[in-house]
Structures are given as C-alpha cells and as structure tokens.
C-alpha cells in the first residue's frame, strides 16, 4: 500500500493516526479560524495528526436556499490563512475541473465528493494539480469499483491518493457502512479513510435537508479502526445545533475531545496486531 506524506506525517500502514476534522462548511472567517485553533490545540494535546477540513461551497445542498458558504475565492483565502497561521494541512471539496485547478494551487489536499467520483474530467484535473487527492467512494458504488477511479487518477500522473468510505445507499434516505469495504479498497494499493460523520446521515431525510444519527459516530469510527482504516474523517463543530450544514451529523468539539484518546488507543492496538 502506498504511503501518502502530508507535511511532517504520513497516512498508511504502520503510520500514526491521522484525522480529517473541521466544520462542514466555512460559516465565517472568524468562526473558521477559531475552529482551526481549537482543533489544533486539541489534537496536539493527544499527539494526533490533524488535517483541517472545511468547504468553501456546499454545492449539493438539499434545498436551493440552504447556506452554501463564502464561495471559491473568499473560501480559499480563508483556508490559505489557516494553513499559514496554524501550520495545518487543509482539505476542501472541489466540484469542477476549474475549481480543482484553483484549489489545488492553494490546498495541500483536495477532495472529490462522493457524488462526483466518476466524473472523468474532474478526476483528471485534480490529478494534474499535483496535490494530494482524497476521493470519496460514491454511495452507489461497490468498493472494488474504485479501481476505475484510481486508474483515471494515475493516468493523470498522480498517485497521491486517499480513498474515503462514507457509507453505501441502503434504501431511501438511509446509508449503511460495510466494513469489508475498507480492506477491499486497501487491496487497490492506497490508504483508506473512513468518514464516520457522513456515514450516519439520512440523506434528504428531513425534507429540505439531511438528517442523521450523531450518536452512532463513535461506534462506526471505532468499527472502522478495528477493520484497519488508515485515517478517520470526522466533521466537527463547537455547537452542532447551530451548524449551517449537516447539523444532525457533525460531532461536538467536546465529544471529539473525549473520544480522541480512545480512537488513538484502538488504532495503535490494531496496528500492533498487524492489520
């Protein structure tokens, strides 16, 4: 399995735990900077590597009038400031070849959303930025189907790939997590990250927005670590009830603070056993 180097740490076999975390969307510059500072301090306390995550545009909101974020230009300015002021690696979503090119020149990691993971032009544009590319497995794909996505990336000259499992469609307005997908995707040669927050979503389950079962985030995160996941993706917020996106499925900073040492201990135990 390929080892993906991010700043002064790496994602892959026998590497320390890495977690991507942050508010789902950039709500304001002040809010985003405070979130980054809080998470940086929290993760340093437990000696866990953090990749800060937030989106400049939530382009796939359920309703047309839902909050989407500050947009590409302003959002990237804020994320670049976080990278420079806090020394954090940053990951953000891209939705078009043009966005991939622009965001890839600013952010160390760009992410292909699950709904867009088969868009060839987007994949190739992301590959050609030279950035690390985190690709979410579509809810509609089998784990082994990601091999075709990988080949597209590699054909674009980029093998700095992180695969992300964020659940699989299970009837209407529901997702299920099949932990077999983690080792199956790892066999494709790249590290696998498990998205524990989007996996508890009820897509469109509240009519004009998605619902979710936040109480299952820790259970799925621990199950994924037990299955050998190389990384976790956990969107977080200082006050989930006030979150402007995915309020039902983001983790409270306070809960994340309590769970980080548990995640780390479990991850290290599994690594010692050679998973």
Curated annotation (Swiss-Prot):
It comes from the Bacteria. GO terms for biological process: keto-3-deoxy-D-manno-octulosonic acid biosynthetic process. Keywords: Cytoplasm, Lipopolysaccharide biosynthesis, Transferase. The keyword Transferase applies. Its EC number is 2.5.1.55. It is found in: Cytoplasm. Pathway: Carbohydrate biosynthesis; 3-deoxy-D-manno-octulosonate biosynthesis; 3-deoxy-D-manno-octulosonate from D-ribulose 5-phosphate: step 2/3; Bacterial outer membrane biogenesis; lipopolysaccharide biosynthesis. It catalyses: D-arabinose 5-phosphate + phosphoenolpyruvate + H2O = 3-deoxy-alpha-D-manno-2-octulosonate-8-phosphate + phosphate. The keyword Hydrolase does not apply. One of its GO terms (cellular component) is cytoplasm. GO terms for molecular function: 3-deoxy-8-phosphooctulonate synthase activity. It is an enzyme of class 2 (transferase). Belongs to the KdsA family. HAMAP family: KDO8P_synth. This is 2-dehydro-3-deoxyphosphooctonate aldolase. It comes from Protochlamydia amoebophila (strain UWE25). The lineage of its organism: Bacteria, Pseudomonadati, Chlamydiota, Chlamydiia, Parachlamydiales. The gene is kdsA.
